[in-house]
Amino acid sequence: MKFLYGIVFIALFLTVMFATQTDGCGPCFTTDANMARKCRECCGGIGKCFGPQCLCNRI
């Protein structure tokens, strides 16, 4: 069972790392009220906070 948890953790980690590298903007913090605006500006007007990440390919 620990092996399965390890595989799931690695898959999740790699997914987050890949998404962060391909989209280039910083994380979205829920404590910052202007985070959605900062994410949009970082992505040239098309960015959107998706969970803790700012993704530039989300509309």
Swiss-Prot record:
GO terms for molecular function: chloride channel regulator activity; peptidase inhibitor activity; toxin activity. Expressed by the venom gland. GO terms for cellular component: extracellular region. Its main location: secreted. It is found in: Secreted. The record marks R37, K38, R40 as: Important for the binding to the catalytic site of MMP2. Keywords: Chloride channel impairing toxin, Disulfide bond, Ion channel impairing toxin, Knottin, Metalloenzyme inhibitor, Metalloprotease inhibitor, Pharmaceutical, Protease inhibitor, Secreted, Signal, Toxin, Voltage-gated chloride channel impairing toxin. Residues 1-24 form the signal peptide. It comes from the Eukaryota. InterPro entries: Scorpion_toxin-like_sf, Scorpion_toxinS_Cl_inh. Toxin with unknown function in healthy organisms. On glioma cells, inhibits chloride currents in a voltage-dependent manner (when tested on gliomas cells). Also interacts with MMP2 and significantly inhibits its catalytic activity. May be internalized with chloride channels (probably ClC-3/CLCN3) and MMP2, thus inhibiting the chloride channels necessary for cell shrinkage and tumor propagation. Negative results: does not inhibit potassium and sodium currents. The presence of a 'disulfide through disulfide knot' structurally defines this protein as a knottin. This is Chlorotoxin-like BmK CT. It comes from Olivierus martensii (Manchurian scorpion).
